[in-house]
Amino acid sequence: MRQKYGQHFLIDKNIICQIVDAAFLLRSEQVVEIGPGKGALTMELAARGLTDFTVVEIDPEMVSFLRAHLPPQAGINIVAENFLKLDWARLRAVPTLFISNLPYMAAADILDKVLAWPHFKTAVFMFQKEHVQKIRARAGDEFYGPLSIFSQLRARVSLVCKVGRSAFAPPPKVESAVLAFEKITPPDVPWEKLRQVVLASFLHRRKTLLNALVLAGYEKEKISAALNILHVPLTVRPEEITAAQYVTLSRFC
């Protein structure tokens, strides 16, 4: 079977079981698997008695494979579509667990879409090491940035397990890890406004936060006032501000 869409198929039974173990701990009213590929996780979910769940697969060849090999008694709903283009109306509007060995090239976009959905409750996702470092980074860390902030403001993130390259076929060039996400109450500011402030701040990482936001068109006086309220110097850089402080900052912009 040909490899398309940057797939690296999970073949390590121990890792498969650890992912499914985590999924069952976080199980919700609806379960959705993204990009099942050959069905390694899907088969394990079904083997443990999970029924009537949904898988979303972009690759027509994989869809045909799944239709031929998944147990019919499990009642698995196969949606042949690009998850990033999926209309949420295709899913039930109930608390949902997402599970996936995420395609590396689309991982950040998929995570953002999932966390933004009002009915997201929990997720168990595998990422390449670089994404894991960015998602878990704190203010002042080397990998801290928008992905860190957007993830941590919407979910409690924990490490499930680390995954070596040999767990896949074909093996990727980098190591991976599995993260669990549990929904938290989002900040009480307009999300798009907060998003634009964060993205503008990190557009010029070598500049001070104040200068970066002024370059983006924000009013210098308002930013200065916000930084004073946060008790941080006007020379602070974007990577030195915590996610919670960005929420406060966005209220002034």
Regions inferred by a protein language model and the residue ranges of each:
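Catalytic cores of RNA-modifying enzymes
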Residues: 1-199, 228, 239, 248
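C-terminal lobe and adjacent flexible extensions of AdoMet/dcAdoMet transferase-like proteins
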Residues: 183, 200-253
